[in-house]
A protein has these predicted regions:
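Short, conserved catalytic-motif segment at the N-terminal edge
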Residues: 2-56, 76, 92-101, 366-367, ...
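Active-site SXXK
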Residues: 4-10, 29, 55-83, 170-175, ...
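Short clusters of small/polar residues that mark proteolytic maturation junctions
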Residues: 36-38, 82, 228-229, 353
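Acidic helix-start/capping segments at beta-turn-to-alpha-helix junctions
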Residues: 84-91
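Short, surface-exposed loop or secondary-structure junction motifs
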Residues: 93-323
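Short glycine-rich, acidic/polar surface loops and turns
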Residues: 298, 310, 326, 333-341
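Short, well-ordered beta-strand elements
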Residues: 339-340, 346-355
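Generic C-terminus detector
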Residues: 353-379
Length: 379
């Protein structure tokens, strides 16, 4: 292994609009690369460190999907189940016609598969009246997710793709199927068995002091400004967002990814059975309409990829021109963090960033880091 080119690229990132970056790579359960560059606070010149915390944003979705798949594995959830089996509020849904604006009863049944696959017809409108009313009443996960069912869907379930609150709804399904709060279930099957301490939904006072600053990038002027907002997906004190609610260190999240990629943790704990990991690696959830919607949403990000049971899933390396094998899966987040699970090579990659609006990151940085990792492993 030779990661010289990866090192060079990492050291160039502060010049490319990335104030701080941390990258952890594991192979066959062992860390083979872990580097931190830049400043956790640019104004104070505080160097980034492995103890830094950051909001994972949509990398949370990977953990939510894995938690749901654990329940699928145990027979407590079926992917084909109607969501209404767990959440009665989703029994009678409405659909708004895109062309006419007419609102009618949904003809198709919303299923758990549609939640996994972002084909539920939902959106990311956090200001919807029903959601705001539930927040004002002090609602938690179940109450706020129930309110999400009030807004008409953008299309019939299963007929297209739209990145949305589907995984927040999936977290509520996990709560019902497990009989536990979402955070309690994650603690039971992931945090405690994997010995993860610096991860969760609500940071302690000590942890708040260790958060790296989040910045906003202007893609036209290429200027960075301090991002004054918090995690806007933390809707209420008792709300646990399955779509974007977790914070973590790169080290803690990397241990989670390693348990999936390697088939077990370094302490021997098995999070998911090999056949479940194989199912995630091989499942493409997209219907023809879903595939059209996916590529319409992200025209240049899914060549050779589709959307499956845990975010993106690699289907065809001859189209993606990637060294990653078929079956690699993972996702990214609003502040440009990125994760990869490669069960074939037992490889995991966790890239931690804190930059909002960094378009370059999704289209260029992520795939480039991925290819440099594989090049380093093979050199």
């Amino acid at each position: 292994m030779n990661f010289k080119e990866l090192d060079q690229f990492m050291n160039q990132l502060p010049e490319r609009g990335v104030p701080a970056c941390e990258l952890a790579v594991t192979l066959e359960g062992k860390t083979v690369y872990h580097e931190v560059v830049g400043y956790a606070n640019v104004a104070e010149k505080r160097p980034a460190a492995r103890s830094d915390l950051r909001w994972l944003f949509s990398c949370t979705k990977v953990m939510t999907c894995i938690a749901a798949m654990r329940l699928v594995e145990e027979g407590k959830i079926a992917i084909s189940d109607p969501v209404s089996r767990y959440l009665p509020e989703y029994t009678h849904l409405k659909v708004k016609n895109k062309e006419t604006g007419e609102i009618t009863d949904a003809r198709e049944t919303l299923t758990v598969a549609h939640l996994f696959g972002m084909m539920g017809g939902m959106d990311y409108d956090l200001k919807a009246p029903g959601i705001q009313e539930a927040i004002a009443k002090g609602g938690g996960t179940r109450e706020i997710v129930a309110a999400m069912a009030e807004k008409p869907l953008h299309f019939e379930p299963g007929t297209s793709f739209r990145y949305s609150l589907c995984h927040d709804v999936l977290a509520a399904v996990v709560e019902v199927a497990s009989g536990m709060r979402f955070s309690e279930y994650l603690d039971k099957i992931i945090f405690t068995p994997l010995e993860l301490t610096d991860i969760g939904f609500v940071p302690t006072a000590e942890q708040e002091k260790r958060f790296a600053e989040t910045y906003k990038y202007d893609n036209i002027t290429r200027e960075l400004t301090l991002y004054s907002g918090k995690n806007e997906y933390w809707l209420a004190p008792e709300y646990e967002s399955g779509g974007a609610g977790l914070f973590s260190t790169v080290t803690a999240y990397s241990k989670f990814l390693t348990a999936l990629a390697n088939g077990k943790a370094d302490n021997g704990y098995v999070l998911l059975k090999p056949e479940t990991i194989r199912m995630i690696s091989e499942t493409d959830l997209m219907t023809p309409g879903g595939r059209d919607g996916l590529h319409e949403s992200w025209p240049s990000r899914f060549f050779g990829y589709s959307w499956g049971l845990c975010g993106r899933v690699h289907l065809d390396p001859t189209i993606s021109f990637s060294a990653a094998p078929k079956g690699e899966f993972g996702w990214d987040g609003a502040a440009c963090s990125y994760c990869l699970i490669d069960p074939v090579n037992r490889l995991s990659v966790m890239l931690g960033l804190n930059v909002r609006g960094y378009t370059y990151g999704y289209h260029m940085l992520h795939p480039h880091v991925r290819e440099l990792v594989y090049a380093g492993l093979n050199s």
